[in-house]
Amino acid sequence: MEIRSMELGGRTGHEAGRLLLSQMYWEKTGSPMPPVLVQERGKPYFGEGSVHFSITHTKRRVLCVLAEKPVGIDAEEMDRQIDLRLAEKILSPGERRQYEAAPDKRLALLRFWVLKEALAKCSGEGLRGYPRQTELSLDDPRIKILDGCLVAVVREK
């Protein structure tokens, strides 16, 4: 699994994401990137081969991950402000207890958010209706800091 990040550099998140994905695909396979297709629920994928990917972008950066199995990535800038009322909508009861005990509620909610988004991207199901059904931990090792972003990467086992 390989994760890479780059500044948007005046490009849209979509443009920068496709550029980074194309570069990473070329470096991994030595071949031009095949067409990107989209599943029914919106998950992009390559129609051929065994390379899986996920892309996310923030205001300043785009991040991409390549893997041999389905994968999802999400990122938020460390300084991003977030409406704390979102906690009521996305956190399970156990997560809510962790959130309430956290010294920095904004950062705790961002940690849960990026992890839930990465899980949703990996599964291809999106966040439609189930974010509170998943019980996660604030200390989940899949959450990292990369280039000033809080990043979560989830891959199928």
Regions found by a protein language model. Name each.
Residues 1-157:
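Core catalytic alpha/beta fold that binds nucleotide/phospho-ligands
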